[in-house]
Amino acid sequence: ENSFLNGQTYSEKLEQFKQQHGEYPPNFIVLSPTQKCNLNCTGCYASSNAHTKPTLSYDMVDRIIHDARNKFHSRFITISGGEPFMYKSQGKTLMDIFEKYNDMFFLVYTNGTLITPEIAERLSRAGNITPAISVEGFEKETDERRGNGTHQKILQAFENLRNAGVPIGISVTATSKNEDILMGDEFYDYYFNELGATYMWEFQLMPMGRSNQA
């Protein structure tokens, strides 16, 4: 039974959950399976501690997703990090999770630098994932915060995902260094019209870790 598509069944399950627990379940969850990352971005809360980078076991990630679907009746999961495409546990990656739970949809916040043509094709075959690639503005702003050459790797990720037919989004953190750029039409023309982004998430800078540098 696929209650992801059956609105009436989904509503009935929500009401049943409320009767049992006194409140509705969360509509979706945000899961950070690893704090490991291949970048060292200024102000990043996820890697603010350079020495402690925990990773959940595959069994734990599988259990969380299973319970979200079967107990909370959720069909939407947000994957954060760290860098999700660095995750590996028990010989498996998040692609194994995406393919196993093919009746769910996953939004993955990623720096994009690890999205090879092979990964993009696998995302396309699964058909239930959209990557939201983190940017800071244009090449200058992105490389200043994320490291030299990062923007070019992002452009390659966009090309790989476009070629594979995977829906792409962007995520951006507003700071004192890019606020003017985010207010201009050129930014949106570039990412949406030229590169093919279909949506955007904008976040406020969290004042923790190395964020005082941004």
Task: Set out the residue ranges of the language-model regions.
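Short connector loops/turns at beta-strand edges and beta->alpha or beta->beta junctions
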Residues: 20, 36, 136-138, 205-207
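Canonical Radical SAM [4Fe-4S] cluster-binding loop centered on the CxxxCxxC motif
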Residues: 23-24, 28-59, 72
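Radical SAM/AdoMet-radical enzyme domain recognition
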Residues: 61-79, 87-204
